[in-house]
Amino acid sequence: MRKELKYLICFNILLLLSIIYYTFDLLTLCIDDTVKDAILEEDLNPDAPPKPQLIPKIIHQTYKTEDIPEHWKEGRQKCLDLHPDYKYILWTDEMAYEFIKEEYPWFLDTFENYKYPIERADAIRYFILSHYGGVYIDLDDGCERKLDPLLAFPAFLRKTSPLGVSNDVMGSVPRHPFFLKALKSLKHYDKYWFIPYMTIMGSTGPLFLSVIWKQYKRWRIPKNGTVRILQPAYYKMHSYSFFSITKGSSWHLDDAKLMKALENHILSCVVTGFIFGFFILYGEFTFYCWLCSKNFSNLTKNWKLNAIKVRFVTILNSLGLRLKLSKSTSDTASATLLARQQKRLRKDSNTNIVLLKSSRKSDVYDLEKNDSSKYSLGNNSS
């Protein structure tokens, strides 16, 4: 096997391993294992007496101010009417800031410097659930039945489409290990991905929470540290569902439309990916052919350390410095220049060029031997 091919294979293996290492959590999201932790029918509608409630009866919601938009008031009121025995807290931006400042000062700098307000709205919900416990509900989610059956689990999230979990409805006991892990991971995932939609999703949104959930499941989960998953049928659109949805996603910017369009054209995205992969492979094949070519071999022979020295000294001399090359370095550079001149001449002529060595008589030099290191360019002789 040619050494060039070995180098190329090793490079591709290292590249592939690096990609797998940095995207492993995203790749694992392709495996839908939410069924293992699903909240079942018998859990929500038990024949026996209901299980004791673990999650505190607190409903948390967030908004910029206390002036909630009109189209969300009906859903909010439904939650209040169905749960008169629950404590209700609407977290405004000012309340969230003061809470982080007083209880989690180590996170205040990150909290203040989030690029998008929705990132702060996402982050605060993890902190309040970890600190107080209870159920967090987005303002665009209206309640359709009592939440009491969901309080029997240490923590719950809801499954989202097509993969992973969402952060619009969540419940937890105080200091649940999953939400503690989420808090500790927020700083690490605070990265700007150039596209607002991906930045929000990956730093604090559902994608972030899904990645943390996958990592958490690889831990040795403590006995009381399980996270149960509310399935889509129990989330909305059925008579037995817990929630209904009104107009939401107020944080979506223009780029979100593109991302949603891509979700609706999965096949086109896959085909585009294959085409892109083909061009990458073709580029690597072209690069390999160049490595194996004579041009590359000549290039590696000519570009020696002495040639680099010549260029470096030339640059310094042009700046006003007066540096001289050693005789051996100068001779090598001259030989390299001569070889390039001969190569250019050979393209235009098939005749022999006579080269004279300073201390020897004239010899006829055959261009095809390309032994330029022993000769200097002279006049033609018969």
UniProtKB/Swiss-Prot annotation:
The keyword Zinc-finger does not apply. Disulfide bonds: none annotated. Its EC number is 2.4.1.370. Pfam families: Gly_transf_sug (PF04488). PANTHER family: MANNOSYL PHOSPHORYLINOSITOL CERAMIDE SYNTHASE (PTHR32385), MANNOSYL PHOSPHORYLINOSITOL CERAMIDE SYNTHASE CSH1-RELATED (PTHR32385:SF20). Signal peptide: none annotated. The gene is SUR1. Gene3D superfamilies: 3.90.550.20. It is an enzyme of class 2 (transferase). The keyword Glycosyltransferase applies. GO terms for cellular component: fungal-type vacuole; fungal-type vacuole membrane; Golgi apparatus; mannosyltransferase complex. The modification Phosphoserine is found at residue 349. It comes from Saccharomyces cerevisiae (strain ATCC 204508 / S288c) (Baker's yeast). Heterodimer of SUR1 and CSG2. Residues 1-6, 291-382 are cytoplasmic. Keywords: Glycosyltransferase, Membrane, Phosphoprotein, Transferase, Transmembrane, Transmembrane helix. This is Mannosyl phosphorylinositol ceramide synthase SUR1. It is found in: Membrane. It catalyses: a 1D-myo-inositol-1-phospho-N-[(R)-2-hydroxy-very-long-chain fatty acyl]-(R)-4-hydroxysphingoid base + GDP-alpha-D-mannose = an alpha-D-mannosyl-(1<->6)-1D-myo-inositol-1-phospho-N-[(R)-2-hydroxy-very-long-chain fatty acyl]-(R)-4-hydroxysphingoid base + GDP + H(+). The chain crosses the membrane at residues 7-27, 270-290. InterPro entries: Glycosyltransferase_domain (IPR051706), GlycoTrfase_DXD_sugar-bd_CS (IPR007577), Nucleotide-diphossugar_trans (IPR029044). One of its GO terms (molecular function) is inositol phosphorylceramide mannosyltransferase activity. Involved in the synthesis of mannosyl phosphorylinositol ceramide. Catalyzes the addition of mannosyl to phosphorylinositol ceramide. Suppressor of RVS161 mutation. Belongs to the glycosyltransferase 32 family.
